[in-house]
Regions:
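Conserved substrate/cofactor phosphate-moiety recognition/catalytic segment
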Residues: 40-98
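A glycine- and Lys/Arg-enriched "phosphate-lid" helix/loop adjacent to the NTP-binding pocket
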Residues: 129-198, 212, 219-223
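Extreme N-terminal, non-catalytic leader segments
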Residues: 1-21
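C-terminal accessory extensions appended to soluble enzyme cores
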Residues: 2-9, 214-228
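Glycine-rich phosphate-binding P-loop
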Residues: 24-39
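Active-site flanking residues adjacent to catalytic metal/cofactor-binding acidic residues
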Residues: 54, 115-117, 153
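Glycine-rich phosphate-binding loop used to anchor ATP phosphates in small-molecule kinases
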Residues: 88-145
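Hydrophobic "anchor" residues on beta-strands that sit immediately upstream
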Residues: 50-51, 112-114, 150
């Protein structure tokens, strides 16, 4: 039996509760996705089933912007931009719920999860865009899966790279502070990763390696010739 089969043969509740979950969060354009993808690539030889847990909110924003453009065109109005989008608590509830679903699917597939953001980060983005009742708090609190480590990507020394939905260069320092404050307040283990891409990757691997001692031995064995 291969190491991948040994993990997926385990009970689903066991996998959800025992997968090592590494969550990457950070302000806009702080190389969070870059680091997440590099970690997945690094660990794929050990865990062939490891998945890229991408940022659901980004695709949701593109879809919302596309729908707003369609509605504006039908009404004969100018094409809207990010500042024209109308966000609701329900939007953030959907984003938080779907982000957790992606994370859990990755936990069922492999004993190591590397997630590019999570429902707790969604809560902070909701704080940025909305005041009042939160739609994502339930998913960021009571329904948030167990975490092993948060990696917060620092904004310092990272140039801001704009795209059609990034609009928060002026808020990056505040967002970094919000992340570290809420992680500390809620008692999560977290580390601020800084420096070059290479340094961030090396530091992240050094932090993750000791956590892998908790992975079932059968899931860590090296694939041998003839394994089925």
């Amino acid at each position: 039996m291969s190491e991948q089969d040994s993990w997926t043969a385990l009970d689903s509740d066991y996998r959800l509760n025992h997968a090592i979950r590494i969550i990457l969060v950070g302000a806009e354009s702080t190389r969070t996705t870059t680091l997440a993808e590099a970690l997945v690539t690094h660990y794929r030889a050990m865990f062939p089933g490891i998945r890229n847990v991408e940022e659901y909110g980004r695709q949701f924003t593109y879809d919302l912007l596309e729908q707003a453009a369609t509605d504006a065109a039908a009404a004969g109005e100018p094409e809207p931009g990010m500042d024209d989008l109308v966000w609701t608590p329900e939007h953030f509830a959907i984003i938080a719920r779907e982000q957790t679903a992606l994370e859990d699917a990755a936990a069922l597939a492999a004993p190591l999860v590397v997630a590019d953001t999570d429902a707790l980060a969604t809560l902070l983005w909701e704080r940025r865009y909305l005041d009042g009742t939160s739609g994502s708090e339930l998913y960021a609190g009571a329904l948030l899966p167990r975490r092993d480590l948060y990696l917060v990507t620092d904004h310092v020394g990272v140039p801001f790279e704009a795209d059609e939905i990034r609009d928060g260069e002026h808020l990056r320092a505040d967002m970094t502070r919000w992340f570290t404050e809420i992680l500390g307040a809620r008692g999560y283990s977290w580390v601020l990763v800084t420096g070059s891409r290479e340094k961030r990757l090396a530091d992240a691997i050094a932090l993750i390696e000791p956590l892998l001692e908790g992975v079932p031995e059968a899931s860590l064995k090296v694939r041998q010739p003839g394994d089925q």
